[in-house]
Amino acid sequence: MVSIFRRKVSQTSEPTFKERVQNFWQWYAERAATFHGNLKQKQHSIIQPQISAKVDELLPSAAWVFGDGPNGNGHSFTLTGEGNLHLQFLTEYWRKQAPSLEGWTFYSSRQPSNDLESWQIKIEGETFNPLEFWLAPNLDQEREKIDITAWHPLFAKLPEKNRWTVLFLVLDEALGEFGTQTWIGEINVSDRRLADALPLKELPAFVGRTEDETGWKKYAPTDTWTGYQMNEPHSRFRRGDIITGTTVNPILLREFLQSDDKLEDPLFNTGADFVFVQFPSEILPGGKQIEKRAQIENALEAALASDAAGQLIGGALGTQFAYIDLLLLDGANSLDIVQKVLRECTLPKGTSIEFYAHSKRDRRIVV
């Protein structure tokens, strides 16, 4: 049976995300052997309250699950942002900071099930067996995605919202969280089984064949860079002058633009922040703007990485300013690192560090 646990979102946030991660791993390492034994004895009820409370301290709104380790060896612990790209950057950082613990493997996203046929989920009093899901696939050549139309005999008994909940859970079981995000495109639900549908258990093999036949390459969402262009630069709000850029978090960019620079904090109560460095684009040499900006980006990325304090997530060029997008994980320390690098790069007057979240705009720093 599926066993994903969630916690209510707490309303306070004091430690930085880096501090939270350090605290979590110290706590977990001290109990890893005990947890291993509890799982071996199937004493899940003993562990669940402890883990849920600690995960709530670490990353509110995240979900977690225990599972088998690779090839059935040992146990695994998965912390997932449940498809939320903003949180997936944080869970991936958490995974990279994990200590080596005997008998344990750690994941930052839900993995494909090793035993899909025995997996079930109950919702609204109905038990859903993955073997009863049928999917009609269609290749979207332009987007390099697989569109699907899904059917299950019990869908008609569920409210529409719950149908989607069940469907995404079983897709994640079949392909893993990242597999669903990177391979599956448009999803529709049908009231009947389509003639060209295949059973859910055959979806992983279909994806594998599609990859071989098309040559489409997929990477983790947190490692997938996207280029973009703006057709109508403007001065109505920050970053409105952008002409072109790249990002590993296109959702952040889209949400910022759609909000007209009134973005609700996408990392609220996590101890982390999305920020951007803004400086006059006129200092970049003609014809080599991207190369010069990349030098500054590389310096920032190296300095933040050396202290596990953040990462580069994008950059852009505008008619007035150039931009470097960052994920900061260690509060004031991360900001100090960024300021030090910017001074070493001798950026001009008018350079600033801006917060994406509208509620934190008054925290901007003029370097």
Where are these predicted regions, by residue range?
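Short amphipathic alpha-helical segments
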Residues: Q43-I47, G83-L87, R163-V166, K288-I296, ...
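Surface-exposed, low-hydrophobicity interaction/linker segments
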Residues: E14, W25-A63, I243-N249, I283-Q311
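C-terminal structured domains
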Residues: E102-W104, Y228-V367
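Acidic, serine/threonine- and glycine-rich low-complexity intrinsically disordered segments
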Residues: I184-Q258
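Long, low-complexity, Ser/Thr/Gly/Pro-rich intrinsically disordered segments that act as flexible linkers
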Residues: V2-Q43, L59-H75, W104-K122, E132, ...
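An N-terminal, globular interaction/scaffold subdomain
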Residues: Q43-W104
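Internal, hydrophobic cores of structured domains that mediate oligomerization or house catalytic pockets
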Residues: T80-K217
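Short glycine-rich, basic-tinged beta-strand/loop micro-motifs
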Residues: Q26-H36, G72-G81, E144-A156, N269-G286, ...
